[in-house]
């Protein structure tokens, strides 16, 4: 069997359909882009560049696909309500966005929120990050888990699952804790309210995890209707993390209230060494042990290249 034949056989038995950037862009069809450069700027992450061309090429087709899934989901809910004789409101559609530190999950989530909010159906779209469900800094220190921050063990998973269950059940004004990247901690007594949205986007490192399922055990992924994994080679992720760390050293870290204010005093060489060490001992380790193994569970994978642009899209069949 030649290489070309092996490739076609591999694709045939893959659970994913693979699209080049050009092929995926064609699936936008005639959907108009209402987002402007001015609208895009506040959606971007720190030290991240993303063009309107990227939005129209990658995210518009994705928003179009998700809307088809939502419409089908609504039809199923109508059938279920008719069967049960219910007049309940529609159940919120939950989208999860997973991936490594520094891959650009937050930007992807905000862009998707903006596009879906402006779709003709005028749906209400809320966005919550799982950072708010990290254990407080004091607890992590007390239990010697600070070096595991971002790992599954550092999250109050039962609290996150209760939040998702309440949202799915249609409860009004469900509270989600707020995390501060400045203080590196949960903000006491401050919450985001999620009030029966049509769509909830949940963004975080480990939202696709299932672990070793025990009887009647519930996972975050059990509440998710459509999952996206933002992917890139680890070498790129590490490079982007170090670059972002250097930018923070000149900006956020200089704030006297910053948990990392001491890093602002580092020379560039010391900062690079520190960031690389953090990656090697924490973020990279978490990626390999906990995040990357969940990639194949996603409904859709966005694979980025060196310029942060998505080069390949994989859609579960």
Swiss-Prot record:
| Pathway annotation | Cofactor biosynthesis; coenzyme A biosynthesis; CoA from (R)-pantothenate: step 1/5
Which reaction(s) does the protein catalyse, per the Swiss-Prot or TrEMBL entry? Answer: (R)-pantothenate + ATP = (R)-4'-phosphopantothenate + ADP + H(+)
Task: Name the enzyme's class.
Answer: transferase
Q: What EC number(s) is this enzyme filed under?
A: 2.7.1.33
Highest taxon, organism lineage = Bacteria
A Pfam match is: PRK
> What would be an example GO MF term here?
pantothenate kinase activity
Indicate where this protein is primarily found: cytoplasm
Q: Where in the cell is the protein located?
A: Cytoplasm
- Please provide the record's keywords in A-Z order: ATP-binding, Coenzyme A biosynthesis, Cytoplasm, Kinase, Nucleotide-binding, Transferase
Q: Name one GO biological process term.
A: coenzyme A biosynthetic process
**Which residues does the record give as ATP binding sites?**
99-106
Q: Which family does it belong to?
A: Belongs to the prokaryotic pantothenate kinase family.
Q: Which PANTHER family match?
A: URIDINE KINASE (PTHR10285)
Protein name stated in the entry: Pantothenate kinase
- Source gene? coaA
